[in-house]
């Protein structure tokens, strides 16, 4: 079924429903019905939320994705140069010959990226303080947000594990990539993996008092929205912080262990697994082939799904 025929079918169905309503109303009118049918059981919508809650909810929907975007782009600039850039320039091997332990080098590079992410969060939280709390700039008449200094501190605390998680993944990505261009190719899928769960707060009916608090990144997105409307469920706020914090700790440990391998710090395309071959290559290639099979399955299901 082509797009043209699908659109034609939709428009025809709408016209048939409209015609049926007109015929039904004409029968009522012909039989002497005293009022117009559309005036029976009318429903009116009334917004009971305050202007502060409306403004906070609207700002809370966009705050997490916006800060995440800035953290990813800002941290990526430093991460790509931390390992991929040094590989390309040939300076990483020189750094590894110093007396500094490899774990210390990885930790220092990770802290550098974390510093960029924290700086992004702090600057934007200060912007909220200046514009919303101190009232330096007059807001539009229909837009109001009521935040206290404690709310801003709570927002900053919620963003801390997200910053560590992003920094760890970006540094790990830089370790896998051998050049700037290869890093840029890998960056876009990672960007989507972080962006999609951060939009959980935009889903209708999504409440922090559910299993979403245990989902990393998504729990932070919903928790930030709750704080912006000044609804504090401390237990679930702690769960959202802890779930993302646990993911950040795991990612940091994984980055430190992974970047200790010779294959990721050298420009050589071969390591022991490449030389041995066979089952030794399975852990490295299984995800790649699984991804290819998943893409093929998705394409086939989209193409032939209606006929199966």
What does each model-identified segment do?
Residues 82, 88, 146-192:
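A structural motif at transmembrane helix-loop-helix junctions in multipass membrane proteins
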Residues 107-136, 161-166, 170:
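Hydrophobic alpha-helical transmembrane segments that constitute the membrane-spanning cores
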Residues 1-70, 74:
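Transport-system extracytoplasmic interface segments
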Residues 68-90, 110, 175:
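A hydrophobic alpha-helix feature that marks transmembrane segments and, especially
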Residues 150, 177-214, 218:
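Transmembrane helix segments
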Residues 82-115:
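Helix-loop-helix units of permease transmembrane domains in multi-pass membrane transporters
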Residues 82-84, 171-181, 246-292, 297-307:
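Junction motif at the cytosolic side of a transmembrane helix
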Residues 53-54, 128-155, 230:
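Membrane-interfacial helix-loop-helix connectors in multipass membrane proteins
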């Amino acid at each position: 079924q082509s797009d043209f025929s699908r659109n034609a079918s939709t428009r025809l169905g709408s016209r048939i429903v409209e015609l049926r309503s007109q015929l039904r109303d004409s029968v009522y009118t012909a039989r002497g019905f005293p009022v117009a049918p559309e005036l029976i059981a009318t429903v009116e919508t009334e917004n009971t939320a305050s202007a502060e809650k409306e403004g906070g909810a609207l700002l809370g929907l966009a705050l997490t994705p916006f800060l995440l975007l800035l953290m990813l782009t800002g941290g990526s600039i430093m991460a790509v140069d931390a390992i991929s850039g040094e590989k390309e320039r040939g300076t990483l091997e020189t750094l590894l010959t110093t007396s500094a332990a490899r774990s210390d080098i990885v930790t220092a590079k990770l802290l550098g990226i974390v510093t960029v992410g924290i700086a992004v969060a702090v600057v934007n939280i200060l912007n909220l303080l200046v514009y919303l709390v101190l009232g330096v700039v007059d807001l539009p008449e229909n837009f109001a947000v009521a935040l206290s200094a404690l709310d801003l501190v709570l927002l900053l605390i919620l963003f801390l594990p997200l910053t560590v998680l992003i920094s760890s993944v970006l540094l790990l990505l830089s370790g896998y990539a051998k050049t700037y261009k290869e890093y840029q190719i890998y960056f876009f899928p990672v960007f989507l993996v972080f962006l999609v769960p951060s939009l959980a707060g935009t889903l209708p009916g999504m409440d922090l008092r559910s299993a979403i608090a245990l989902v990393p990144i998504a729990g932070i997105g919903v928790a930030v929205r709750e704080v912006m409307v000044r609804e504090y469920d401390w237990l679930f706020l702690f769960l959202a912080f802890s779930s993302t914090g646990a993911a950040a700790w795991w990612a940091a440990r994984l980055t430190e262990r992974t970047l200790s391998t010779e294959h990721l710090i050298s420009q050589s395309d071969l390591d022991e697994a490449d030389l041995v071959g066979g089952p030794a290559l399975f852990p490295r290639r299984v995800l790649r082939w699984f991804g290819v099979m998943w893409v093929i399955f998705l394409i086939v299901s989209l193409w032939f799904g209606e006929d199966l």
